Amino acid sequence: MATLQNPKDISRRKFMAVAGGVAGLAAMAAMGISAEHGECSANIPEIDIDNMTYAESEADLLVIGGGMAGLFATVKAHDAGSKVMLVSKGRLGSSGQTPFAKGIFAFDPSSTKISLDDFVDQVSRSALGTNNPVYTRQMAEHSLARVNELREWGFFESPLYNNCFNKPIKERNISVYERIVITHLIKEDGRIAGAAGFSLDEEKIHVFRAKSVILCTGAGGFKPNGFPICDLTHDGTVMAYHIGAKVTGKEWNDGHPGQATNAAACFDGWGNMFERKPGVTSVEVHHDLGVDLNYAAYMTANPIRMGRPGIRLQKKIEGGPFRPAEFNRSGPPEREQGPRKDPREGGAPPGMGGTPVGGSSAGMSIHKSEGLVPINEKCESNIPGLYAAGDALGSYMAGAIYTQVGSSLAGSAVQGAVAAEAAAEYCRGVEMPEISEAKMNEVQEEILAPLKREAGYSPAWVTQTLQGIMIPNFIIYIKKESLLKAALAYVEELRDHHMPMLRAGDLHELRLVFETSNMIISAEMKLKASIMRKESRCSHFRLDYPDMDTKNWNAWINICKGSDGSMKLEKQPFDSWPT
């Protein structure tokens, strides 16, 4: 991007556009804000906004996301008779957490030693009641069929998924739009009407009109180091929140560790997960990857040597997260439990050697425990026509702790198919919605606003500031009200002042602006839900409320945007659907 240090690279038009901001920058320097370091600076776009083009596409059903859930949502919606489009911020099968997931669970009644009922009961006991047994059963019941279809497409023959994902897509001649950043879900007359965003490869705004939308956008975090989620920022969840969808699961935490050596090098810690072919896992219910290690590190202030998940540390530490004794294990964990080399390469098995480092997946909850609130077993949200699947759906399939290895990928496949069939049925009963010209203009202005801003905050700097607020162990993992409220004050400042002033100079930075904004809203959700849940359970631990409270907190927390624009929180009792 051109800078003020290279005046010959600046046209007269661009110079005039930013000249008014220069005086402001001088004042900012007096306040200790340095444009040189990117906090706040003049914006000199590389893009001629006046030459941005516009494209509109239409289909019965729009699938957003190119991972496992998106694949099955697209294929099954087509097979159910809908005209389908798939749009992805990345590449089909190569973005989000799907490329990293190498274990997929299959419940095979012919070989499994326990019944389906027993499996669901085991998951419920491990999850301490936080799972939705309807979605637990649904995942197990349909997992084998989805695994068999993946086998037909060549899924288990390569560590890379793009080719096998493309096989059923190309056979059905389904339209796929890759490297499109969706920034807005569009609602008209109380129901979903489509989505809009921009291309990362050309100066073009895209509007997609559809009768129904299935969000397969995954979960997200705060772009932490050491775990492969840096392209996931809760985009789908936050877009849906802005149009009135209910969101759940923000107080829970994913406990995947990184490694202390080269902590920011994701491939160093998890490379074997990307390089090996996927496999099938069988029934083995765990209670893993909560915040046990975070608590141990907090209490001892020492590096914690990695042990087998489910096994208490040798040194007795008083208090901490409750683990059902039934799920304390003595055997080695499944291979995808921790970042280590494959034993065949001479390294220790995952989770059994080295020094772990926390915060590697900061901002993400347990798989399937956060996202849009389903109003039924069909992955349907409270917005007519809007569905979600996989990590974008707060189905509580496994509860608020990791229970069954491989069920995350299986759940994405199963829910993608379930959502597709329900959405296709919905499409048959409605007409194609009209999107008003006023709405089109409003969305386009919001997309282009960061490029038009004469000066503002760098999204990279705001992201780093947010990480400094949210990722400390004593904020997001080991919680107490005073610190949660202190962090919330900072996040609300970012929301109210810095977020409206984010600027972008090119398409890459424009993507970062929207991702940063989504992370700020997600941080607010996490802090407010963590303050509201006054107990400790599974992957949520409060120092000031260290015990489980079954009298008051056998409930999930749902979040929605009020009519005044403020964030509203409510309880939804376990074993119930939202009202």
Model-inferred region functions:
Residues 1-11, 37-39:
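N-terminal secretory signal peptides
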Residues 11-19, 28:
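N-terminal export leaders
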Residues 18, 50, 82, 89-204, ...:
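Conserved N-terminal/central alpha/beta ligand/cofactor-binding core
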Residues 22, 43-52, 57-59, 73, ...:
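Glycine- and aromatic-enriched mobile tails/lids
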Residues 57-59, 203-212, 382:
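Core beta-strand elements of the Rossmann-like FAD/NAD(P) dinucleotide-binding domain
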Residues 61-85:
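N-terminal Rossmann-like FAD-binding beta1-loop-alpha1 element of flavoenzymes
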Residues 299-372, 383, 390:
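C-terminal catalytic lobe of FAD-dependent flavoproteins
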